[in-house]
Amino acid sequence: MNRNTRTLRTLLVAATCVLGQALGQAETVEKLANEIRNAYSLGDAAKAVKLATDGIQKHPDNTTLLTLRGRIHEEENQPAKAEADFTTILKKEPNNSGLYHRRGVVRFFQLKFDDSLADFDKFIEMVPGQEPYHWQRGLVHYYAGKYKAGRKQFEVHQTVNTQDVENAVWHYLCVAKTDGVAEAEKHFIKITSDRRVPLKQIHALFAGKGTEQQVLDAIKAGDPSAGALARNQFYGHLYLGLYFESQGKEEKAAKYIALSAKGHESHGYMGQVARVHHEWLQQKAKSKPTRKGSK
């Protein structure tokens, strides 16, 4: 056996060992990932997080387990922990466009509006074809005070979601902030086929053709089930609050927003919007200067 042959065999053996270790690690990570998913699917979030945390310590360079833990934190309404995991991943995977979206979401849930918007903008920069679908970005524009950009986002979203009262309302809110309620009503987007209760009455209210009482009556009309009633109340209260806020009736707005924020966990992303808005109003109330002589 000559020296070159021995060297080649040595390299092949070493490469085989390294490949074997890599494959073994991959199998271990995938097995652990499946255990984490299984634990979470069975309702044991604490076990799933512990499995992920232990696995991350053993495989610090692998992002699969970090991603799983971050998503669990997000689902369990722990946005700060989710943000930390997503940030760690993005340092290792700066081209992971989906993680910018996910981090933007959990930053919004923490009222970090500018940071959230930066992440959503980065996501759109990387995946421009998603811009028309990204209504979440429009919401953050509103809370960040970027009303013209918000108006544009909701107009673009209208091209792919033509019968959504919520999109029309948020467009109205952005226009009202820059041009006043008369212009907002003038440019209010016409919606004819959104069957969610009581959004037909909400649309009429913002169009200047409906009343608060009509919305409240629609919420209870038809003897809805407990679940349907809760959903009707949520949407009714949220958009009544936003309507009165746009009209400058702060106390009435705050009352309805507070009602919509109760039980927000049951209403998905918009439930989180209600909570965020409620906390945002509370923050602004605390920051208002106290009148001289008041206690």
Predicted regions and their residues:
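Structural marker of alpha-solenoid helical repeat scaffolds
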Residues: 58, 92, 126, 160-161, ...
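Residue-level recognition of tetratricopeptide repeat
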Residues: 37, 71, 105, 139, ...
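Alpha-helical segment of the N-proximal tetratricopeptide repeat
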Residues: 28-54, 58-61, 68-75, 236-243
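Register position in tetratricopeptide repeats
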Residues: 41-42, 75-76, 109-110, 143-144, ...
